Amino acid sequence: MRKLIAGAFAAALMGTAAGATGLKIEIEGEANGTVMIDLLEEVAPQHVAQITELAAAGAYDGVVFHRVIDGFMAQTGDVQFGKEGGDLGRAGMGGSDMPDVPAEFSDVPYDKGVVGMARSQNPNSANSQFFIMFDAGHFLNGQYTVVGRVTEGQDVVDAIKRGTGGNGAVVGTPDLMRKVTVTE
Protein backbone atom coordinates (compact mmCIF):
# COMPACT_ATOMS: atom_id res chain seq x y z
CA MET A 1 0.00 0.00 0.00
CA ARG A 2 2.86 2.39 0.83
CA LYS A 3 4.41 1.78 -2.61
CA LEU A 4 1.06 2.53 -4.26
CA ILE A 5 0.64 5.78 -2.32
CA ALA A 6 4.27 6.78 -2.94
CA GLY A 7 3.86 6.02 -6.65
CA ALA A 8 0.69 8.09 -6.89
CA PHE A 9 2.37 10.96 -5.04
CA ALA A 10 5.41 10.81 -7.35
CA ALA A 11 3.16 10.76 -10.42
CA ALA A 12 1.26 13.79 -9.11
CA LEU A 13 4.50 15.67 -8.49
CA MET A 14 5.80 14.78 -11.94
CA GLY A 15 2.59 16.04 -13.51
CA THR A 16 2.82 19.36 -11.72
CA ALA A 17 6.55 19.69 -12.41
CA ALA A 18 5.99 19.58 -16.15
CA GLY A 19 2.48 21.06 -15.85
CA ALA A 20 2.03 21.04 -19.59
CA THR A 21 0.85 19.09 -22.53
CA GLY A 22 2.38 21.26 -25.21
CA LEU A 23 4.16 24.29 -26.55
CA LYS A 24 2.89 27.11 -28.74
CA ILE A 25 5.79 28.56 -30.74
CA GLU A 26 5.36 31.82 -32.66
CA ILE A 27 7.97 31.87 -35.44
CA GLU A 28 9.16 34.96 -37.35
CA GLY A 29 11.42 35.37 -40.37
CA GLU A 30 11.13 33.66 -43.73
CA ALA A 31 8.68 31.43 -41.88
CA ASN A 32 5.86 33.28 -40.18
CA GLY A 33 3.23 31.59 -38.08
CA THR A 34 2.43 29.41 -35.13
CA VAL A 35 3.57 25.87 -34.43
CA MET A 36 1.78 23.71 -31.86
CA ILE A 37 3.73 20.87 -30.28
CA ASP A 38 2.26 18.01 -28.26
CA LEU A 39 4.79 17.13 -25.55
CA LEU A 40 5.30 13.45 -24.73
CA GLU A 41 5.62 13.60 -20.94
CA GLU A 42 5.15 9.84 -20.67
CA VAL A 43 8.14 9.25 -22.99
CA ALA A 44 10.61 11.84 -21.65
CA PRO A 45 9.36 13.32 -18.36
CA GLN A 46 12.66 14.91 -17.29
CA HIS A 47 13.29 16.56 -20.66
CA VAL A 48 9.71 17.81 -20.93
CA ALA A 49 9.92 19.25 -17.40
CA GLN A 50 13.13 21.10 -18.30
CA ILE A 51 11.94 22.61 -21.59
CA THR A 52 8.57 23.63 -20.15
CA GLU A 53 10.32 25.32 -17.22
CA LEU A 54 12.55 27.20 -19.66
CA ALA A 55 9.56 28.14 -21.84
CA ALA A 56 7.51 29.32 -18.85
CA ALA A 57 10.43 31.53 -17.77
CA GLY A 58 10.60 33.13 -21.24
CA ALA A 59 14.07 31.70 -21.91
CA TYR A 60 13.17 30.60 -25.46
CA ASP A 61 11.66 33.95 -26.50
CA GLY A 62 13.82 35.55 -29.20
CA VAL A 63 16.01 32.46 -29.75
CA VAL A 64 17.05 31.79 -33.36
CA PHE A 65 17.04 28.65 -35.48
CA HIS A 66 20.83 28.47 -35.78
CA ARG A 67 21.23 25.13 -37.58
CA VAL A 68 18.79 24.24 -40.35
CA ILE A 69 19.51 21.40 -42.78
CA ASP A 70 17.18 21.00 -45.76
CA GLY A 71 15.47 17.60 -45.79
CA PHE A 72 16.56 16.93 -42.20
CA MET A 73 15.75 19.32 -39.35
CA ALA A 74 15.67 22.83 -37.84
CA GLN A 75 17.58 23.27 -34.56
CA THR A 76 16.99 26.00 -31.97
CA GLY A 77 16.91 26.49 -28.21
CA ASP A 78 20.39 27.83 -27.42
CA VAL A 79 19.21 30.19 -24.69
CA GLN A 80 22.81 31.18 -23.86
CA PHE A 81 24.26 32.16 -27.26
CA GLY A 82 21.28 32.06 -29.63
CA LYS A 83 19.32 35.17 -28.64
CA GLU A 84 18.25 37.67 -31.28
CA GLY A 85 20.48 40.75 -31.27
CA GLY A 86 23.43 38.93 -29.71
CA ASP A 87 26.65 37.66 -31.27
CA LEU A 88 25.32 34.54 -32.99
CA GLY A 89 28.83 33.28 -33.81
CA ARG A 90 28.59 30.85 -30.88
CA ALA A 91 24.94 29.91 -31.37
CA GLY A 92 24.59 26.18 -30.90
CA MET A 93 27.39 25.92 -28.34
CA GLY A 94 25.40 26.91 -25.29
CA GLY A 95 22.59 25.82 -23.05
CA SER A 96 20.79 27.02 -19.97
CA ASP A 97 21.89 27.41 -16.36
CA MET A 98 19.94 24.24 -15.57
CA PRO A 99 21.76 20.89 -15.35
CA ASP A 100 22.00 18.59 -18.35
CA VAL A 101 19.33 15.89 -18.50
CA PRO A 102 20.11 12.14 -18.70
CA ALA A 103 19.02 10.42 -21.92
CA GLU A 104 15.42 9.18 -22.08
CA PHE A 105 15.60 7.16 -25.29
CA SER A 106 12.39 5.53 -26.51
CA ASP A 107 10.97 3.57 -29.41
CA VAL A 108 9.19 6.65 -30.83
CA PRO A 109 10.53 6.96 -34.41
CA TYR A 110 11.99 10.14 -35.83
CA ASP A 111 9.32 10.90 -38.42
CA LYS A 112 8.41 14.25 -39.98
CA GLY A 113 7.29 16.69 -37.27
CA VAL A 114 8.94 14.86 -34.38
CA VAL A 115 10.75 17.08 -31.85
CA GLY A 116 13.99 15.79 -30.34
CA MET A 117 16.58 17.07 -27.90
CA ALA A 118 19.95 18.14 -29.27
CA ARG A 119 23.06 17.04 -27.40
CA SER A 120 26.80 16.58 -27.72
CA GLN A 121 28.40 13.17 -28.28
CA ASN A 122 27.59 12.45 -24.63
CA PRO A 123 24.06 10.97 -24.62
CA ASN A 124 23.43 12.55 -21.20
CA SER A 125 24.19 16.13 -22.29
CA ALA A 126 20.81 17.45 -23.52
CA ASN A 127 19.97 20.78 -21.92
CA SER A 128 17.88 23.39 -23.75
CA GLN A 129 18.42 22.89 -27.48
CA PHE A 130 15.92 20.94 -29.56
CA PHE A 131 15.18 20.22 -33.20
CA ILE A 132 12.10 19.68 -35.35
CA MET A 133 12.22 17.16 -38.18
CA PHE A 134 11.49 18.21 -41.79
CA ASP A 135 11.36 14.56 -42.82
CA ALA A 136 11.96 11.10 -41.36
CA GLY A 137 15.42 10.52 -39.89
CA HIS A 138 15.24 6.98 -38.54
CA PHE A 139 19.01 6.81 -38.07
CA LEU A 140 18.32 8.96 -34.96
CA ASN A 141 15.95 6.37 -33.45
CA GLY A 142 17.10 5.32 -29.99
CA GLN A 143 20.03 7.78 -30.17
CA TYR A 144 18.33 11.07 -29.28
CA THR A 145 15.49 11.77 -26.83
CA VAL A 146 12.08 12.41 -28.42
CA VAL A 147 10.08 15.06 -26.54
CA GLY A 148 7.13 15.84 -28.79
CA ARG A 149 5.35 16.07 -32.13
CA VAL A 150 4.10 18.96 -34.24
CA THR A 151 0.29 18.88 -34.27
CA GLU A 152 -0.29 22.17 -36.13
CA GLY A 153 1.95 24.37 -38.23
CA GLN A 154 4.25 21.87 -39.94
CA ASP A 155 3.96 24.16 -42.99
CA VAL A 156 5.52 26.92 -40.87
CA VAL A 157 8.34 24.59 -39.82
CA ASP A 158 8.89 23.61 -43.46
CA ALA A 159 9.33 27.31 -44.37
CA ILE A 160 12.11 28.03 -41.83
CA LYS A 161 15.17 29.64 -43.46
CA ARG A 162 17.70 26.99 -44.43
CA GLY A 163 21.35 27.01 -43.50
CA THR A 164 24.30 26.40 -45.78
CA GLY A 165 27.09 23.86 -45.94
CA GLY A 166 27.26 20.49 -44.27
CA ASN A 167 26.58 21.82 -40.78
CA GLY A 168 23.50 23.85 -41.78
CA ALA A 169 24.68 27.10 -40.18
CA VAL A 170 22.26 29.90 -41.04
CA VAL A 171 23.90 32.90 -42.72
CA GLY A 172 22.49 36.40 -42.38
CA THR A 173 19.35 36.83 -40.31
CA PRO A 174 17.99 33.50 -39.07
CA ASP A 175 14.34 32.81 -38.33
CA LEU A 176 13.50 32.86 -34.63
CA MET A 177 11.05 31.85 -31.96
CA ARG A 178 9.46 35.19 -31.07
CA LYS A 179 7.39 33.72 -28.23
CA VAL A 180 7.15 30.23 -26.73
CA THR A 181 4.17 29.51 -24.48
CA VAL A 182 3.39 26.42 -22.42
CA THR A 183 -0.08 25.05 -23.18
CA GLU A 184 -2.33 22.75 -21.20
Residue ranges and their predicted role:
Residues 2-7, 15-184:
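Cyclophilin-like peptidyl-prolyl cis-trans isomerases
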